[in-house]
Amino acid sequence: SYVQSFARGLEVIRSFSADAPSQTLSEVASRTGLTRAGARRILLTLQTLGYVEGDGKYFALTPRSLDLGFAYLSSQPLWNLATPLMETLAESVQESCSAGVLDGLDIVHVARVHTHKIMSTNLGVGSRLPAFWTSMGRVLLAGLSDDRLQALMATRPREAFTRYTLME
């Protein structure tokens, strides 16, 4: 059955991002919809377990939090097989190469090979983008059955990313 406190703990972890790498207790509570007391208990638990560090005012994830995502990646040998092929492709086209999976209506990058260019996008493993906005996402959505695609599309309204975003 559903364990609400566990779900809240995951929400606290997910509240940290490139935009909010360190946060006060109030910021975590606000971003997660938790009370300050609830957010504090979860942060202190995560700190005791080594997933979060705090200096008395700000909290931040520790490298140990990578273990959570690495468990998925290491359990999927496909990504280990894909990386050499992606490296060859990236070298031949002189562009970065990514592999991703659908997570609802988002794509999550699970492997990425960067090229060395002056200008590049800041997408790494774990980056999440709406599938509808990206070519990779549209390819993955196209592989779904019509019923599954319609069910997913009903869960979230589509928004144009730019004025050029195709909305069909």
Residue ranges and their predicted role:
Residues 16, 70, 137, 160-164:
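Conserved short-loop catalytic and cofactor-binding motifs
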Residues 58-156:
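Amphipathic alpha-helical effector-binding/dimerization core
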